């Protein structure tokens, strides 16, 4: 099997941070070479843009925000993702372009056609081989976000914003079931872990 590009995505409060540890443990047990990274971020340029994008004090228009996301992504692809894949290393990214369709598209209202143009220009033919989409009901997401001490620029949004974000994620997953695995992360930790491990086992033929 060629090196796999796997993404982990979902609305805020879906438990990505917790379940990244599950994925790391899965790769470690099998001794598979893997690189973990994140978006926006993953490079010095990307991390600098992340600081701007998540800062609650940032006043950026929709197009500027979207372009910053893709600028960080282009650097990420060129400097991190493609080199790792070329070296035979699997890549797991905490968020990727699905998040742009969901947050800037669904949440903010950026036309999906414009995002698709940028996606093609920045990524070429690069697409994830597998996307683990962590999903929780809106009220669970909002409750978990409410427990965050310092909310970033996106976490400060209201429930209707996250309702639109979640809807886009689920619609994209339904339209491409061969790539997406929707994980109910409202279940207990053991059940979520088992679900993720089952998907990875199936994808890698373990």
UniProtKB/Swiss-Prot annotation:
InterPro entries: P-loop_NTPase, Thymidylate_kin-like_dom, Thymidylate_kinase. It holds the Pfam family Thymidylate_kin. It catalyses: dTMP + ATP = dTDP + ADP. CDD domains: TMPK. GO terms for molecular function: ATP binding; dTMP kinase activity. ATP binds at residues 10-17. It is an enzyme of class 2 (transferase). Its EC number is 2.7.4.9. GO terms for cellular component: cytosol. GO terms for biological process: dTDP biosynthetic process; dTTP biosynthetic process; dUDP biosynthetic process. The keyword Kinase applies. Keywords: ATP-binding, Kinase, Nucleotide biosynthesis, Nucleotide-binding, Transferase. Phosphorylation of dTMP to form dTDP in both de novo and salvage pathways of dTTP synthesis. Belongs to the thymidylate kinase family. This is Thymidylate kinase. It comes from Neisseria meningitidis serogroup C / serotype 2a (strain ATCC 700532 / DSM 15464 / FAM18).
């Amino acid at each position: 099997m060629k090196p796999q590009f796997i993404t982990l995505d979902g609305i805020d409060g879906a438990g990505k941070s917790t379940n990244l540890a599950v994925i790391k443990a899965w790769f470690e047990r099998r001794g598979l070479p893997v690189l973990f990274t994140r978006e926006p971020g993953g490079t010095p340029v990307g991390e600098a843009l992340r600081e701007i994008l998540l800062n609650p004090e940032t006043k950026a228009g929709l197009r500027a925000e979207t372009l910053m996301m893709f600028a960080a992504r282009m650097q990420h692809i060129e400097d991190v993702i493609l080199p790792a894949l070329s070296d035979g290393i699997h890549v797991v990214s905490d968020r990727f372009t699905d998040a742009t369709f969901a947050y800037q598209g669904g949440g903010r209202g950026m036309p999906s056609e414009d995002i698709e143009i940028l996606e093609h220009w920045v990524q070429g033919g690069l697409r994830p081989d597998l996307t683990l989409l962590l999903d929780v009901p809106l009220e669970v997401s909002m409750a978990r976000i409410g427990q965050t001490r310092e909310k970033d620029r996106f976490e400060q949004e209201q429930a209707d914003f996250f309702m639109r974000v979640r809807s886009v994620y689920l619609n994209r997953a339904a339209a491409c079931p061969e790539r997406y695995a929707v994980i109910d992360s409202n279940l207990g930790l053991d059940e979520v872990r088992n679900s993720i491990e089952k998907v990875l086992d199936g994808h890698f033929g373990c």
